[in-house]
Curated annotation (Swiss-Prot):
Its cofactor is Mn(2+). InterPro entries: 2-IPM_HCS-like, 2-isopropylmalate_synth_dimer, AIPM/Hcit_synth_CS, Aldolase_TIM, LeuA/HCS_post-cat, LeuA_allosteric_dom_sf, LeuA_bact_synth, PYR_CT. Mn(2+) binds at residues 14, 202, 204, 238. The gene is leuA. GO terms for cellular component: cytoplasm. It catalyses: 3-methyl-2-oxobutanoate + acetyl-CoA + H2O = (2S)-2-isopropylmalate + CoA + H(+). One of its GO terms (biological process) is L-leucine biosynthetic process. Residues 391-505 are annotated as: Regulatory domain. Keywords: Amino-acid biosynthesis, Branched-chain amino acid biosynthesis, Cytoplasm, Leucine biosynthesis, Manganese, Metal-binding, Transferase. It is found in: Cytoplasm. GO terms for molecular function: 2-isopropylmalate synthase activity; acetyl-CoA C-acetyltransferase activity; manganese ion binding. NCBIfam families: leuA_bact, PRK00915.1-2, PRK00915.1-3, PRK00915.1-4, PRK00915.1-5. Belongs to the alpha-IPM synthase/homocitrate synthase family. LeuA type 1 subfamily. This is 2-isopropylmalate synthase.
Length: 505
């Protein structure tokens, strides 16, 4: 049996099903490119039948992202499968991922099908997909709650029909590691032909055991694990890819397995996904959380200073957390700026570099020292792939304990300056109302949050907010500035630009 574990990333499909997450096509392509750079083996780009937007995202990723298998999801029916192939056909390595539920509860209440009907549908779906491509993955939805004998019949039939990957999902996060490992082991011994295919698992985190269950499956023969960056996904999320990868890497003595992941890209990938989805990473999150390599207790600090391995089982550099001593400031030139960005893994076009350098110089006038975190924030803001319908020109605020908060905002559109003023329940509310007056939109802000990019009085504030115009589709906006209110205005304009761009497509 191969010692390689394939990494199947579903950030753009299952991950995007997280409540409040809505990515546009450009953002999905940007994440897909970074996933390819990270070294994932398969990117599940979306579910093409569900919407024109999903179809376009899968199609664009298939055309633009190279060196990786691109998968499209489809239910076990011909219409879904045909649509999936139409979207993914231009990929260098296309895969159709088709699924049907096998648990009695799903058969009775969702599908309203008999076991034999499900078996026939699975076989027909795999054959249809194989007519298009030699790479077909079959998933038995809710496998962990399925009758084992029936599940094995379906898996055997799917293999005989031509499936090359057999995925066994713990769809509702019901399994526990010891049980799940035995479950996978039993399937290996009961399903004819299973040695000819790659066995995969897709574990959810409802009981907090998605990563543990995935690793238990690997110990029992699974050679593909499915998950999402930062563990995002429906309900409590998916298995976190960064945690599975670093567990396999750090505990080679236990697993004796490897992946093709470039671990130094993990942190940058995590930050990109967090920035574009608006889902913040909890500070104590394993591997990529803000506190993952922080030591506050005096004994721990003393130990780490004397010898890092006393309290750190991973080197921060392994996952791409930089400890560079190079500090940039207002006297730093374009060459030093470009050099540092290249060291950090960013390769910008001349146009992007010029724009980013202008932002850097403006920030350097306000901050004495520019850190890597500041640079990352600048680049993330620069690389947002939405046309700037409106740009913030200026902002004046009047606020206080005895004054009604008032904001005067100036925006530019097509070179024309537009100004409006508004009062609000607070300065941020006043800013948003003034912007709505200019744009003619009536948006509702559903969340607002700020992170300090670095420490100190002159720290950059990174504001992330979510807005909706119809109560359904949510748009994430981000803005950075040393001024919290300016960052809020930038974030709101960013969200509004996304909304306008989406409505014009």
């Amino acid at each position: 049996m191969s010692q390689r574990v394939y990494i199947f990333d579903t950030t753009l499909r299952d991950g995007e099903q997280s409540p409040g997450v809505s990515l546009n096509v450009g953002e999905k392509v940007q994440i897909a490119r970074q996933l390819a750079k990270l070294g994932v083996d398969i990117i599940e780009a979306g579910f093409p039948i569900t919407s024109p937007g999903d179809f376009k995202a899968v199609s664009e990723i298939a055309r633009q992202v190279k060196g990786v298998t691109v998968a499209a999801l489809a239910r076990a029916n011909f219409q879904d499968i045909d649509r999936a192939w139409e979207a993914v056909r231009h990929a260098e390595q296309p895969r159709i991922h088709t699924f049907i539920a096998t648990s009695d509860i799903h058969l009775k209440y969702k599908l309203r099908m008999s076991r034999e009907e499900v078996l026939d549908a699975a076989v027909a779906a795999v054959k249809r997909a194989r007519a298009y491509t030699g790479d077909v993955e079959f998933s038995a939805e809710d496998a962990s709650r399925s009758d084992l004998d029936f599940l094995c019949r379906v898996l055997a039939a799917a293999i005989e029909a031509g499936a090359t990957v057999i995925n066994i999902p713990d769809t509702v996060g019901y399994a526990v590691p010891e049980e799940w490992g035995k479950f996978i082991n039993t399937i290996y011994h009961k399903v004819p032909g299973i040695e000819k295919v790659i066995v995969s698992v897709h574990c959810h985190n409802d009981l907090g055991m998605a990563v543990a269950n995935s690793l238990a499956a690997v110990m029992n023969g699974a050679r593909q694990v499915e998950g999402a960056i930062n563990g995002i996904g429906e309900r409590a999320g998916n298995a976190a890819i960064e945690e599975m990868v670093m567990a396999l890497y750090t505990r080679k003595d236990q697993y004796n397995l490897y992946t093709n992941i470039k671990t130094e890209e993990i942190y940058r990938t995590s930050k990109l996904v967090s920035a574009l989805t608006g889902m913040k990473v909890q500070p104590n999150k394993a591997v990529v959380g803000k506190n993952a390599f922080a030591h506050e207790a005096g004994i721990h600090q003393d130990g780490v200073l004397k010898e890092r391995t006393t309290y750190e089982i991973m080197n921060p550099a392994m996952v791409g957390i930089s400890k560079s001593n190079l500090v940039l400031g207002k006297h730093s030139g374009r060459h030093a700026f470009r050099h540092r960005l290249e060291e950090m893994g960013y390769n910008l076009s001349d146009e992007e570099l010029n724009s980013a350098f202008e932002r850097f110089k403006k920030l350097a006038d306000k901050k004495m020292e520019i850190t890597d975190e500041d640079l990352e924030a600048i680049i993330e803001e620069e690389m947002r792939l939405v046309p700037h319908t409106y740009t913030l020109e200026y902002l004046h605020i009047s606020s206080g304990t005895t004054v009604v908060p008032t904001a005067t905002v100036g925006l530019k559109r097509d070179g024309q300056l537009m100004e409006e003023a508004a009062c609000g329940n607070g300065p941020v509310d006043a800013i948003c109302k003034a912007i709505d007056k200019i744009t003619g939109l009536n948006c509702t802000m559903t969340s607002w949050g700020i992170n300090a990019v670095t420490a100190g009085k002159d720290a950059l504030g990174d504001v992330s907010l979510k807005v909706t115009a119809d109560g359904e589709k949510v748009y994430v906006g981000r803005g950075i500035s040393t001024d919290v209110l300016e960052a809020s205005a930038k974030a709101y304009v960013n969200a509004v630009n996304k909304l306008i761009w989406d409505s014009q497509k």
